[in-house]
From Swiss-Prot:
The keyword Transcription regulation does not apply. Zn(2+) 1 binds at C137, C139, C201, C204. It comes from Homo sapiens (Human). The keyword Calcium does not apply. InterPro entries: CENP-V-like (IPR052355), CENP-V/GFA (IPR006913), Mss4-like_sf (IPR011057). This is Centromere protein V-like protein 3. Binds 2 Zn(2+) ions per subunit.
Length: 272
């Protein structure tokens, strides 16, 4: 007598035969996988090649899913940020080598900061043939520096105001003149007839420089207010200050108008 097979077992072991219709379905067990992980797959065509393609696609999806999950748990290290630029070195941090002692001596002798000492050296390079003069008023409240030749050409004006205050000066461009200190101590007098600004120290009354209103690019500096050691020679050139009678008449009118004494300034201060 023949054995009676279980219908489910027979259906599972059944293989496709050439005579089966194309629409027949075959149940294929997935090799190498457990029933829980890889259930039976039904392919409409009943082809092993189609099942393998589907299985490969499923495995690739699982691999990508595991890779994404691993990346979210353990992200890749980000690229290191670029180092911030190093701050600019200050003059104190410059590698001066064997010249550091000379640098410090020069700076202390002139009483300058590192920036001021560097400016003096750069100005010396930019103004060849000129000398760095320093000066100020009698009490020291006003101090200035100017680049000018060692041989000074001094103007001696004969106008009424310059004769009364004995003002002699040499002219320099404003770019070469620097007021070091005392801006708050300066009192400026402006005459009524000539556009000139005569600056005096409010403490000691010494006039060390003046400027012209018409040409602020030029300063007149008093040579007798310069510090010693930088002037080699002085050449004085006298210039006329106009008609004394006309100046006296203008001064008389100004006295009655302003109730205070005023006198004309140098008429040639605007020149050069």
């Amino acid at each position: 007598m023949g054995r009676v097979r279980n219908r489910a077992t027979a259906q599972r072991r059944r293989r496709k035969r050439p005579g089966d219709p194309p629409a027949a379905c075959a149940a294929i067990a997935v090799m190498g996988a457990s029933r829980a992980q890889c259930p039976r797959v039904q392919v409409g065509v009943g082809s092993h090649a189609a099942a393998k393609r589907w299985l490969g696609k499923l495995r690739r999806k699982r691999r990508w899913r595991r890779a994404r999950e691993a990346g979210s748990r353990d992200p890749l290290p980000s690229a290191p940020l670029p180092d911030p630029p190093a701050p600019a070195e200050s003059p104190k941090e410059l590698d001066l080598g064997a010249q550091r002692e000379r640098w410090e001596t020069f700076r202390k002798l002139w009483g300058l900061s590192c920036e001021g000492a560097a400016k003096v050296l750069l100005d010396t390079f930019e103004y060849p043939g000129l000398v760095h003069h320093t000066g100020g008023c009698h009490c020291g409240a006003v101090r200035f520096a100017v680049w000018a030749p060692a041989d000074l050409r001094v103007v001696d004006c004969s106008c009424r105001l310059c004769r009364k205050k004995q003002h002699r000066h040499f002219l320099v461009p404003a770019s070469r003149f620097t007021l070091l200190q005392g801006a708050e101590s300066i009192v400026t007098y402006r005459s009524n007839t000539h556009p000139a600004l005569h600056s005096f120290c409010s403490r000691c009354g010494v006039q060390s420089f003046h400027a012209a209103v018409s040409d602020p690019r030029v300063y007149g500096v008093a040579p007798h207010c310069l510090d010693e050691g930088t002037v080699r020679s002085v050449v004085i050139e006298e210039v006329g200050g106009g008609d004394p009678g006309e100046e006296a008449a203008e001064e008389h009118k100004a006295i009655h108008k302003t109730s205070s004494q005023s006198a004309p300034a140098c008429p040639r201060e605007q020149e050069q």
